[in-house]
Amino acid sequence: MNPGVPSFNSIHRQEESSMFARHRSSLFILLAHPALILFVNASASAADESVIGVGHRRQLFVDGSLIERTDDVRRVLHHPTRREIALQSEHRWEKYGVSYMVTFRDGDRFRAWYRVDAALLGKTPRRAMTAYAESDDGIHWRKPKLGIIEFEGSKENNLVWDGRGANMAPFRDDNPQAKPDERYKAIVRARDVYALVSPDGLHWKSAEKNPIFTDRPFDSHNIAFWDPQEKQYVAYTRGVRRDGKLGRGMQSRFKGGVRWVRRATSKDFRNWTTLEPIRTGDAPREEFYTNATIRYQRAPDYLLMFPSRFATAREPKPGWEFGKGVNDIAFLSSRDGIHFDRTFLEAFIRPGLDQGNWHERSLYMERGILQTSPTELSLFCMQNWRLPTVQIRRYTIRPDGFVSVQAGYRGGELLTKPLRFSGRRLFLNYSTSAIGSFQVEIQDRDGKPLAGFALADCPEIYGDRIDAAVRWNAGDDVSSLAGKAVRIRFVMSDADLFAFRFGQ
């Protein structure tokens, strides 16, 4: 375990109010038999360690860490729906590319920064810069004339950076200690990686003369952000991986390995730990060109990664004059930031029917997940690279809808590990067919149904809801169980369960 990364249990463990209260019934034994004190305390501590504290935080099923047992259900990766073009090449400075976008909500607007290319990749002179766009709804975008950077004799453009380095990855720094004139930060890649700061996200300057990362290669969209869960800055950059079994469609040609993702952390954004490769267990070694890693705000226990998977052994569409290979988008998740769950090896986004996506480097997930309606998350993907039709297209998916626990017509069930929660009600994000259903049972740590919360006490639940409270015959109040070790049993038929949480 990386010493700079909190463990799963350390993130979730809920402290009891009093060790004495927890072991009051054992006090006489401990006084009469002091030799047993270590045994009793060790047993109690081990039991407490086995309980996962979820508090009132939303829990997903992107990994199996909460699951004790399943019967006739499976975890399923879902796929976003292709929508309209969000950004495309319109201006002279965008002629040969719009790509590597970062977007987030900032107050009452959505903001985006993206790379533009004024000359064709591989041709000279080549000029890669950073442009800016904004939106009121996260769907329709405008490119304001900012008057900051001169291009071909005019500042009538939306450019915000043309200095050293390209592939800017900005973020709003929510570190309480951040200086007002450094409220926005970014990293850019020249040959090495440099840090930038800004008071407003538009006017940028170098944070330091020297680069923050020099352990090349970095030719990718390297990402950095302030992580409120870890209370430190985190970066995910390009790396090279040489271990493990080579995945389907891959070949070792990049310095004897494949392109991979590395991670580092910092307390001050200037001084960073050594870059460390992410770990994916025994999953096959695949080439990850970009990473688009983000802390999922609706369920902040989870980091999600959407790397562009580069199948370098595949031939592109006939007549393609540039490089070999094709891309799709993969899906990974992590709770500690270094160990990523790789259960789902199939693509999250395929190239699809658009033939402009069937060549190398032509499908990159951009960094950012925007909630554009109560029932919709928007994601963005660069497509048609090196073509006049190069674009950043919007995709949508239901909130928390990346992975579900799914039961077929014949039904099945899931039992969680022991959990400890806070709150008064249990909320589910679910979808059933017209004949599908859910029932929910709450058990004690040992698997015994609790009075009033047994399966027989829960009327059938059906429909399609993002955040609906579970009701039993006696009502929906579960506050009497808060702070105790409980298990949740979900019995379901022709249904998907995306997430659950406890709350008021």
Identify the meaning behind each predicted range.
Residues 1-26:
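N-terminal secretory signal peptides that target proteins for export/translocation
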Residues 5-7, 32, 128:
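Residue-level detector of alpha-helix boundary/anchor positions
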Residues 10-12, 21, 31, 172, ...:
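Intrinsically disordered, low-complexity regions enriched for glutamine and histidine
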Residues 46-504:
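Carbohydrate-active catalytic/glycan-binding domains of CAZyme proteins
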Residues 6, 41-43:
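N-terminal non-cleavable signal-anchor helices
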Residues 11-14, 42, 206:
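Juxtamembrane/membrane-water interface recognition
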